[in-house]
A protein has these predicted regions:
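Active-site helix-to-loop segments that bind/position phosphate- or nucleotide-bearing substrates
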Residues: 1-107, 111
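Compact, glycine/acidic-enriched structural inserts
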Residues: 106-128
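Flexible, glycine/charged-enriched surface loops at secondary-structure junctions
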Residues: 45-54, 130-146
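Short, surface-exposed, charged/polar-biased interaction segments
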Residues: 53-56, 60, 106, 135, ...
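Short terminal or interdomain "cap/linker" segment that borders an active site or interface and mediates
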Residues: 89, 137-163
Length: 163
């Protein structure tokens, strides 16, 4: 499903750049703003959301997908279902980043932070939408979790994308 992103939070961009509350230089502010505007014009955010019942063994029902590690199974232990959310900004975001990498490593780093903040914003919006839908069913969402967080291997990304 295509979604519309109207803003990319500057604070989140600064977080991805390792900012810890110190004053932000005017040149950096300008570069961030330029990349925010460019990204909002060029990206094509899309999401896929699927809800799966959980089998007693912790796998997603009717699949062989079992989240590895201890964190996710513990988080889902009292749950009846799990929601998989996949988000992308589209191929143009990757092309933008590749072009910027050939011009300036510093600017490419800033653009990468802008794009990372953009995909987080897309996921945040979807999470809010899902919270509302689940509340109507008297259900609640756990925290969002992704391969690479906690003890869930990043390699699970490829497996979860199949669903």
């Amino acid at each position: 499903m295509q979604v519309t992103l109207t803003q990319i939070p500057t604070r989140e961009i600064l977080h991805f750049l390792g900012w810890h509350g110190t004053p932000v230089e005017p040149g950096l502010k300008e570069t961030i703003k330029r990349f925010q505007e460019k990204a909002l014009r060029k990206i094509e955010p899309r999401v896929v959301v699927r809800e799966f019942e959980l089998s007693p063994d912790g796998t997603l029902a009717h699949t062989r997908f079992l989240p590895l590690g201890k964190d996710v199974p513990a988080m889902l232990s009292d749950c009846r279902s799990a929601v998989l959310l996949a988000a992308t900004l589209g191929a143009e975001s990757e092309r933008m980043l590749l072009r910027e990498q050939s011009r300036s490593a510093a600017d490419a780093l800033i653009l990468d932070a802008v794009l990372s903040a953009a995909v987080e914003a897309v996921c945040d919006e979807q999470e809010e939408r899902l919270r509302g839908e689940f509340a109507e069913r008297s259900l609640f969402l756990t925290d969002r979790f992704s391969p690479g967080y906690g003890d869930m291997p990043i390699a699970q990304s490829r497996k979860s994308a199949k669903f």
